[in-house]
From Swiss-Prot:
GO terms for molecular function: dihydrolipoyllysine-residue acetyltransferase activity. It comes from Rickettsia felis (strain ATCC VR-1525 / URRWXCal2) (Rickettsia azadi). This is Dihydrolipoyllysine-residue acetyltransferase component of pyruvate dehydrogenase complex. Its cofactor is (R)-lipoate. The modification N6-lipoyllysine is found at residue 43. Binds 1 lipoyl cofactor covalently. GO terms for biological process: pyruvate decarboxylation to acetyl-CoA. Residues 132-169 form the Peripheral subunit-binding (PSBD) domain. Disulfide bonds: none annotated. Its EC number is 2.3.1.12. Keywords: Acyltransferase, Lipoyl, Transferase. It catalyses: N(6)-[(R)-dihydrolipoyl]-L-lysyl-[protein] + acetyl-CoA = N(6)-[(R)-S(8)-acetyldihydrolipoyl]-L-lysyl-[protein] + CoA. The gene is pdhC. The pyruvate dehydrogenase complex catalyzes the overall conversion of pyruvate to acetyl-CoA and CO(2). It contains multiple copies of three enzymatic components: pyruvate dehydrogenase (E1), dihydrolipoamide acetyltransferase (E2) and lipoamide dehydrogenase (E3).
Length: 412
């Protein structure tokens, strides 16, 4: 009897996904545990393993298909000797989804519009000189200060077309071509990750009452301790500590002291998290993901750094599992490496807080009534006022500042 292969549910919020690639073809033998396809979810590309043994009799949904509903039929396994008519009847009975191939065939293409203009426009007669030119060629000639009389047309009946203008070489230095790309834009279809980011962030800005608190942190002591640790492990690059590792640990320790900031909004109740699980924003080629450092308050700086390096690598390779990016009680977004001084990040619902971290820079400060130089880092907390009151947010930032400016406290 034929066996269904269904579009898997890879996360609690997943309702549809993109079937990125088939790793088996029709007629191939399939064994339990073999990877047969790759599914693109809102956060990563996941591998699909076969559960049953059989022959891949029919691929119902081709690769590069978008928006395939979960639990819909994507392929059929058969046993040896089953007839094709039985397979076709089985598919007709169980299939209720039409594939939506990932294609830009229906998107308007600017160069096609240009071609149509050149092919369909009527030939225009210019006074007694009888110069024939397409409207596009005339526009380009005007932009480049080119006299049409000096251009030889290569189109039908000597008609001047776009390419004649673009390839024209002036006879004097006074005639100069200004080449402009006639295609004003290019269209890139939104992938699943970009659609989810757009949906969730729009929902956040429209429904979550954000408020923002900022604070400056002196990171001179932190930079000194970081240098000492990295010198101690100079031969082992996997143990090199980043400033962001210290920031994650400082947030974890601050949340341990201020558990009211480690919370999520619900219509009927606020959820206060017993575990300190911190989401860290990581930029990838197709958008943004937030892998989670779980129980961050229980890890030392070396353990946390190694785990974060592994999560970043998996994120950039699209290899994160759902357990590694779903959940979390607090998010960190660090744009300091781009030279950004400060910014207001958008909360990731249902979380109630996200902290934006800016670049560290030397500034003049007053200490003991004396002007001195210190390395200062700006951080801004975005908080959901339904969950976190202003005083709680301020107390959290004060605790974070304490750990950053006295890093030995979080290494004990």
């Amino acid at each position: 009897m034929p066996i269904k292969i269904l579009m898997p549910v890879l996360s609690p919020t997943m309702t549809e996904g993109n079937l990125a690639r088939w790793l088996k073809k029709e007629g191939d033998k399939v064994n339990p545990g073999e990877v047969i396809a790759e599914i693109e979810t809102d956060k990563a590309t996941m591998e699909v393993e076969a559960v049953d043994e059989g022959i891949l009799a029919k691929i119902v949904i081709p690769q590069n298909s978008q928006n395939v509903p979960v639990n819909s039929l994507i392929a059929v396994l058969s046993e040896e000797g089953e007839e094709k008519t039985d397979i076709d009847a089985f598919i007709a009975k169980n299939n209720n989804v039409s594939p939506s191939p990932k294609t830009d065939a229906n998107l308007p293409k600017p160069h096609e519009n240009i071609a149509k203009v050149e092919e369909q426009v009527a030939v225009i007669k210019h006074d007694a000189s009888k110069i024939f030119a397409s409207p596009l060629a005339k526009r380009l000639a005007k932009m480049g200060n080119i006299r049409l009389e000096s251009v030889k047309g290569s189109g039908p009946h000597g008609r001047i077309v776009k390419q004649d203008i673009l390839s024209y070489t002036p006879s004097t230095v006074h005639n100069k071509i200004v080449s402009r790309n006639p295609e004003e834009y290019r269209l890139v279809p939104n992938n699943n990750i970009r659609k989810i980011i757009a949906k969730r962030l729009l929902e956040s800005k429209q429904t979550v009452p954000h408020f923002y608190l900022s604070i400056e942190c002196n990171v001179d002591k932190l930079l000194d301790i970081r240098e000492d640790i990295n010198k101690s492990f100079s031969e082992d690059k996997s143990t090199r500590i980043s400033v962001n590792d210290f920031i994650i640990l400082a947030v974890a320790k601050a949340l341990q002291e201020l558990p009211n900031a480690n919370a999520s909004w619900g219509e009927d109740a606020i959820r206060y998290h017993n575990n300190v699980d911190i989401s860290v924003a990581v930029a990838i080629e197709n958008g943004l993901v937030t892998p989670i450092v779980k129980n961050a308050n229980q890890k030392n700086i070396i353990e946390l750094s190694r785990e974060m390096k592994e999560l970043i690598k998996k994120a950039k390779d699209n290899k994160l599992t759902p357990e590694e990016f779903q959940g979390g009680g607090f998010t960190i977004s660090n744009l300091g490496m781009y030279g950004i001084k400060n910014f207001n990040a958008i909360i990731n619902p249902p979380q109630s807080c996200i902290m934006g971290v800016g670049a560290s820079a030397k500034r003049a400060i007053v200490k003991n009534d004396q002007v001195t130089i210190a390395t200062i880092m700006d951080v801004t907390l975005s908080a959901d006022h339904r969950v976190v009151d202003g005083a709680v947010g301020a107390e959290f930032l004060a605790a974070f500042k304490k750990f950053i400016e006295s890093p030995a406290l979080m290494l004990i």
